[in-house]
C-alpha cells in the first residue's frame, strides 16, 4: 500500500479528504499537531516546530519564508532546523509504513519516494471555502479576507 501526501488550498477541505482516505484505508494520518507530537519520539526540538506550525493566515512553508525575510542571516539556522525537523519526522513516519500526510511540505519531502501518491486539493468555489472556515470558528469578516 502507498502513502498519500496532501497539500491544499486554505479552506478547500483537503484535511477532511486526507482524514477520510486514512480511515477508509485504515492507515494513520498526520497533520500539524500529530506531526509535532510524533516528532517528540524522534528527539526533534518541539518548541521550534510549534512556533512555526501552520496557522489561520499562512502555511508552514509561508511562515518559514516570512521568517527568512526578517533577518536572513540570523534566522537561517533556525529555518533549517524547522524544515529538517519536520522532514525527518515525516520521513521516519513514512518508513514505519503507509500513512496520509497532510500539509507541512509533505509532498516535497516525499516526492522522491516511489510508494507515495501526492495530491493538491483545490476548491474553486469561494463561498464553499468561506463556509468551511466558519466550522473552525473564524469570524465572518475574517473569513472573506483570508480567502483571496
Predicted regions and their residues:
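ATP-dependent NMP and nucleoside kinases share a basic, alpha-helical "lid"
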Residues: 89-134
Amino acid at each position: 500500500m502507498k502513502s498519500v501526501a496532501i497539500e491544499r488550498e486554505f479552506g478547500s477541505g483537503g484535511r477532511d479528504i486526507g482524514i477520510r482516505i486514512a480511515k477508509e484505508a485504515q492507515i494513520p494520518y498526520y497533520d500539524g499537531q500529530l506531526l509535532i507530537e510524533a516528532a517528540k519520539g524522534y528527539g526533534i526540538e518541539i518548541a521550534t516546530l510549534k512556533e512555526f506550525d501552520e496557522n489561520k493566515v499562512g502555511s508552514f512553508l509561508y511562515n518559514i519564508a516570512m521568517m527568512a525575510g526578517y533577518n536572513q542571516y540570523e534566522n537561517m539556522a533556525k529555518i533549517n532546523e524547522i524544515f529538517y525537523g519536520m522532514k525527518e519526522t515525516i520521513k521516519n513516519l513514512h518508513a514505519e509504513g503507509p500513512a496520509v500526510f497532510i500539509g507541512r511540505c509533505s509532498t516535497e519531502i516525499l516526492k522522491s519516494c516511489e510508494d507515495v501518491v501526492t495530491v493538491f486539493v483545490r476548491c474553486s468555489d469561494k463561498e464553499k471555502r468561506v463556509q468551511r472556515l466558519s466550522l473552525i470558528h473564524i469570524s465572518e469578516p475574517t473569513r472573506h479576507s483570508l480567502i483571496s
